[in-house]
From Swiss-Prot:
Protein name: Trans-cinnamate 4-monooxygenase
A GO molecular-function descriptor: iron ion binding
Keyword set includes Mitochondrion: no
Compartments reported by the entry: Membrane
Cofactor(s), by name: heme
Gene: C4H
GO annotation terms (biological process): alkaloid metabolic process; lignin metabolic process
Family: Belongs to the cytochrome P450 family.
Species of the source: Narcissus pseudonarcissus (Daffodil)
Tissue specificity as recorded in UniProt: Mostly expressed in stems, and, to a lower extent, in bulbs, roots, leaves and flowers.
């Protein structure tokens, strides 16, 4: 069977080579394409650049080929943008033209070929899903309603760490407890639910499945079958696992969360006053026929991935940088004590009165951007970008990390220096008012979760620095902050063991 498959693949390669040469000659004469490495038939630049298209590798290619360059990855055109002006064109000036999302074989499984909001093409479905998700998740009213819960969850983290005798001595992997915090923050909003401990069986099952989903989706392992369709048969096993993980996750969402809310909805008023949490609004939209059950599940999918994981990565990065820069940590602690008073616990409204805390968050998002290439964009039709022709259905990557770390635009960008946002970059905000710094994207397809992420980061990091001296474990001068990049993500390769010595007030 494998021999037959190999023969068919080789035959397909032969015809694909001929087809690729013909198409290349026909298109190459009439299009002015961005520069880039010379492609070979069928494989394009895949053999030259490999699968690992992370932000640092792409920044290296930008130094060689310029602020816009083209990679032909098999049959896919990949355009990489690395300047503020071109980022403005993609995300804002021509935001509609480049406002769709690319598809790939794995995300087609996890999103039902774009039935969600984050990965759907630009159009009526996206507008509807964005509208339905915004009111229950992404408004100031939601922040005001749930910020007390975020403060409570942060207080519980502080108490749990204080109770752990290992924390002040050998240290603990704080990330596991912070993961519980983030799930509780978002599951309170979404389902009016929380988990009592990191050992909760349902929490363990949920995080295991979500972790497997992220590993499968973020891996570069499947790129060859996505870029070169004739090799896709070799992905059968991988895609089968993806389908199984999706089915198990969706069954868990339905059995343990959605069905419970549906039962509660049948026993309470159906007007807005009777709606307690976000999923009630979503289910109400389903009941009205605006969306179907699959759309509901894909909304839950988006929140589990896009809201929980990215904010968790940023919290983890922020703490690691503070441990490795004790002078910054102490300066932040001094601000908290001076503005709020020693031992007075930070609340969400306080975060806006703490400029150095805001600068620490901004600097974390600059240096360690959770989604360094943003979520890829796509033009449905032939388009222009700068002086170049962009063929229809090209994948457009904006290297937002390089925009924020290019020494041509930033002073000593490799340094973790929050002071830059109080000095030379004092007017730069995370909302995209400067296209050198767009950690949440800009425009129609920007991340609406910014309204939740920033206060959660402020409360969580603020409480930890207020209550503990955060140190590397015995025998280490610094934490290992080696990066682990994925299709979109940037997180720490090894979750850090951190010593947390309680402060006495």
């Amino acid at each position: 069977m494998d021999l037959i498959l190999l023969e068919k693949s080789l035959l397909a390669v032969f015809f694909a080579v001929i087809f690729s040469i013909i198409v290349s000659k026909l298109r190459g004469k009439k299009l002015k394409l961005p520069p880039g490495p010379f492609p070979v038939p069928v494989f394009g630049n895949w053999i030259q650049v490999g699968d690992d298209l992370n932000h640092r590798n792409l920044a290296g290619l930008a130094k060689k080929f310029g602020d816009i360059f083209l990679l032909r990855m098999g049959q896919r055109n990949l355009v990489v943008v690395s300047s503020p002006d071109l980022a403005r064109d993609v995300l804002h000036t021509h935001g509609v033209e480049f406002g769709s999302r690319t598809r790939n074989v794995v995300f087609d499984i996890f999103t039902g070929k774009g039935q969600d909001m984050v990965f759907t093409v630009y159009g009526e479905h996206w507008r509807k899903m964005r509208r339905i998700m915004t009111v229950p998740f992404f408004t100031n009213k939601v922040v005001n309603q749930y910020r007390f819960g975020w403060e409570e969850e942060a207080a519980r983290v502080v108490e749990d760490v204080k109770k752990d005798p290992m924390a002040a001595a050998e240290g603990i992997v704080l990330r596991r407890r912070l993961q519980l915090l983030m799930y509780n923050n978002m599951y309170r909003i979404m389902f009016d639910r929380r988990f009592e401990s990191v050992d909760d069986p349902l929490f363990l099952k949920l995080t295991a499945l979500n972790g497997e989903r992220s590993r499968l989706a973020q891996s570069f392992e499947y790129n060859y079958g996505d870029f070169i369709p004739i090799l896709r048969p070799f992905l059968r096993g991988y895609l089968k696992i993806c389908k199984q993980v999706k089915e198990r996750r969706f069954k868990l969402f339905k059995d343990y969360f959605l069905e419970e809310r549906k039962k509660l909805a049948s026993t309470k008023p159906t007007d807005n006053a009777g709606l307690k949490c976000a999923i009630d609004h979503i289910l109400d939209a389903e009941k009205k026929g605006e969306i179907n059950e699959d759309n509901v599940l894909y909304i839950v999918e988006n929140i589990n991935v896009a809201a929980i994981e990215t904010t968790l990565w940023s919290i983890e990065w922020g703490i690691a940088e503070l441990v490795n820069h004790p002078n910054v940590q102490q300066k932040l602690r001094n601000e908290l004590d001076a503005v709020l008073g020693p031992g007075v616990q930070i609340t969400e409204p306080d975060t806006y009165r703490l400029p150095y805390l805001q600068a620490v968050i901004k600097e974390t998002l600059r240096l360690r951007m959770a989604i360094p290439l943003l979520v890829p964009h796509m033009n449905l039709y032939d388009a222009k970008l700068g002086s170049y022709d962009i063929p229809a259905e090209s994948k457009i990557l904006v290297n937002a990390w390089w925009l924020a770390n290019n020494p041509a635009h930033w002073k000593d960008p490799q340094e973790f220096r929050p002071e830059r946002f109080l000095e030379e970059e004092a007017k730069v905000e995370a909302n995209g008012n400067d296209f050198r710094y767009i950690p949440f994207g800009v425009g129609r397809r920007s991340c609406p979760g910014i309204i939740l992420a920033l206060p959660i980061l402020g409360i969580t990091i603020g409480r930890l620095v207020q209550n503990f001296e955060l140190l590397p474990p015995p025998g280490q001068d610094k934490l290992d902050t080696t990066e682990k990049g994925g299709q979109f993500s940037l997180h720490i390769l090894k979750h850090s063991t951190i010593v947390a010595k309680p402060r006495v007030f």
